Amino acid sequence: MEPVELITSKAISRDEVITFLLQMGVEREESPHRIWDYVIRRGEAIVWVDPDDVEHYPDPEVDALIENKLGGPPQTYVVLHISRNPGSEQLALELAIQFAKRWPSVLDNLSGLARRIFALDDLQTLYNRGLGLREDAKGVPLPKEWVDAGEEYLAPWQIEELEKQNREFLEIQE
């Protein structure tokens, strides 16, 4: 599952977002095992919707890009959780396009390697070409420090923990 975030410069109530989603074919998820309350399905394609995402972790560079593309500060965030099933990304694009036609919006693909902020025109181009929201990431090589041939990648915190454990082990041996 891959999350993307719809961001609009309009302050939209949760009820208004849900009304729009229901008009677009999104349904309330009734499963007792659900993670999110809303879902849209078409064949194998599935997109879960979190209509009132309240988690926002500031990133000044990305926030400035979003605000610049929106033409104002972000007000409402809606997260689409895209299944990896065939057709799910196109279904998410359709929903995002309709959302962006209704309210001034951008879509953040939340990709760590190739993060992009898409406006309505960008979304329509991707959809018409049959491309996905992470096409850029497919051609981006992993940074060299992440993976060196023949070496296991250890995050800095893992190295620090191993060094700490090694010091403790050596102290016990003495």
Indicate where each model-derived feature is located.
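Acidic, proline/glycine-rich low-complexity IDRs
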Residues: E27, E94-E174
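Short, intrinsically disordered low-complexity segments
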Residues: D15, M24-Q90
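Short, extreme N-terminal segment that most often corresponds to the first beta-strand
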Residues: M1-R41, E168-E174
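Aromatic-residue detector
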Residues: I18, Y77, R116-A119
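Hydrophobic beta-strand segments of well-ordered beta-sheets in folded domains
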Residues: P3-E5, T76-V78, P104-S105
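Long, contiguous binding/interaction regions
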Residues: E2, Y38, I46-I66, G150, ...
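Short, flexible beta-strand-to-coil junctions
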Residues: S9-I12, L80-S88, Q98-K101, L110-G112
